[in-house]
Amino acid sequence: MPVRLTILGSGSSGNCAYLETDETRLLIDAGFSLRQIRQRLASIGRAPENLTGILVTHEHSDHVQSLPALSEKLRIPVYCNRPTQEAVEYQFQTRLVCRLFETGASFE
């Protein structure tokens, strides 16, 4: 199964990567504005509307800046652990629908 991994940006101003397989189109972190994520995905011929999920590594703002906009407006599932969910909900004063995983455990 071919895997495509593209780093869309990494640094103190934001972190975001795109992972694609035959069945999955995953954004890893959402540390840029929704507009910037759209532009960065467009530069590789992709769009946020086609994402199958967003994997959040942790709750720092340079990893979650547009997470509420992506998940709520575009109805994209969010994958994270419970502490990250709670921190993001507190930070943005919103409720996220997350598919939770345990840190260190495998999941599909």
How would you describe each model-predicted region?
Residues 1-44:
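Conserved beta-strand hairpin/beta-sheet module of binuclear metal-dependent hydrolase folds
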Residues 34-85:
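Active-site metal-binding motif and surrounding structural segment of the metallo-beta-lactamase
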Residues 5, 78, 96-98:
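Generic structural signal for residues in well-ordered beta-strands
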Residues 82-108:
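Metallo-beta-lactamase
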Residues 22, 71-73, 92-93:
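Short glycine-enriched loop/turn motifs at secondary-structure junctions
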Residues 16-17, 60, 107-108:
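Short, solvent-exposed polar/charged micro-motifs at secondary-structure junctions
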